[in-house]
């Protein structure tokens, strides 16, 4: 008697994706951390643009606007660096810093918009120089990223 062997080709089992292995909670945590980091970098860019305007474009001699540019840089630096600290125990601080980053970006955008159309504290800006375009882009990215970060946090808690 001959024995018939069943012929089969062995194929290696595909490796599951990291996202499948880690589950939705870890994926959400990664997305949250990525959004927080993106928002932090955008806030730091907003501050850097204001520092550049303060020092290089001589906004430091404009009476009220100059000190506001310096304060914007200082606030953006504190907020951005605080958001980059990756400690799980700082969740409440990250929440407050994200709200602060959104507030800083929205306020910067609003003050620029006002100063383009009428004098603000005795100063009126004009045109869209490269610095203004970079600041507007960074402010938009900061708001979108930090709002999305807060939304992922809220969804994870629910």
Predicted regions and their residues:
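Membrane-interface extramembranous regions
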Residues: 2-158
């Amino acid at each position: 008697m001959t024995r018939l062997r069943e012929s089969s080709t062995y194929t290696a089992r595909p490796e599951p994706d990291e996202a499948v292995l880690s589950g939705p909670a870890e994926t959400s945590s990664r997305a949250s951390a990525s959004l927080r980091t993106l928002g932090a970098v955008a806030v730091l860019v907003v501050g850097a643009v204001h520092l550049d305007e303060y020092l290089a474009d001589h906004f430091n001699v404009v009476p009220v606007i100059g000190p506001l540019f310096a304060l914007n840089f200082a606030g953006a630096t504190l907020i951005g660096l605080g958001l980059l600290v990756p400690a799980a125990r700082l969740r409440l601080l990250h929440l407050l810093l994200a709200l602060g980053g959104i507030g800083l970006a929205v306020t910067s955008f609003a003050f620029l918009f006002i100063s383009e159309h009428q004098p603000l504290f005795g100063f009126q800006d004009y045109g869209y120089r490269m610095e203004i375009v970079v600041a507007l882009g960074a402010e938009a990215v900061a708001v979108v990223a930090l709002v999305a970060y807060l939304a992922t946090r809220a969804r994870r808690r629910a």
